């Protein structure tokens, strides 16, 4: 098959990165799935450190009454810390680490394929993720910061009186770019799992980990466009004088909550289902046995994803 042969040639060519001196250009050009998986894990670790430092600051501030770190002149910084901690831990630590990192490293191995279907798209996804992190951090130093909470509920996120509009815009841009990265990674996993399986590997005999990523990718592709639409409506209310969520002029702020939690509730299972697959790998490898009840576990994860998206 011409496509598989081309992927093998690209994979062999990119595996030579280990013998070369690592530079920024080599990081940008690398399309090897193992290298990108390691980059995802390292990026998630760095992003997680920043989120952890913010949580430490919150705990120090709450250690006793009164102001300990946050100055009385900038009380909004506490709300900014809560917002950034939620964004960094959910969208930049757990999702890139479990889904992008372990997925890129192990999915082609379990499928018996040399690479993912679209290596360049895979590389583009992690570059977008890094850029989205910069946008989120930029919101911290832009004007007074976006202290909206990680849910970005209107009217707080659309009000000029309580926050900085440019900071909220940076937060929204960061989330939109992170969503694009997750959607591209999900499409890559879906096409790899369904089209680049080995001849002897069927969906019934496929291990739990590829199944977990297949289900997780399906939830991301279903829910992230809804969240992106809601965020664009908030951005339009904030900068384009639209009135989607302004109750004074006939808007409905509850409508945003419906749109957000169509993503927010499946997000809980998007974070945990890849961990189910990773635990199955660990148990199977340590015991040198096939997981008992493989089909039942696949059915359970599918029902979890369906019910989580409907509720």
Predicted regions and their residues:
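Membrane-embedded translocation segments of transport machinery
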Residues: 247-253, 259-268, 272-311
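Membrane-interfacial alpha-helical segments at the cytosolic side of multi-pass membrane proteins
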Residues: 91-103, 228, 270-286
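Membrane-interface helix-loop-helix modules in multi-pass inner-membrane proteins
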Residues: 59-190, 197-200, 234, 240-245, ...
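Membrane-interfacial loop-to-helix junctions in multi-pass inner-membrane proteins
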Residues: 25-42, 111-131, 162-175, 194-220, ...
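Membrane-embedded alpha-helical bundles that constitute the cytochrome b-like, heme-associated redox core
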Residues: 9, 19, 23-24, 53-67, ...
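Hydrophobic alpha-helical membrane-insertion segments
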Residues: 43-53, 125-141, 215-233
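Membrane-proximal N-terminal segments immediately preceding the first transmembrane helix
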Residues: 13-28, 107
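Single conserved hydrophobic/aromatic residue that forms the stacking wall/gate
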Residues: 1-8, 12
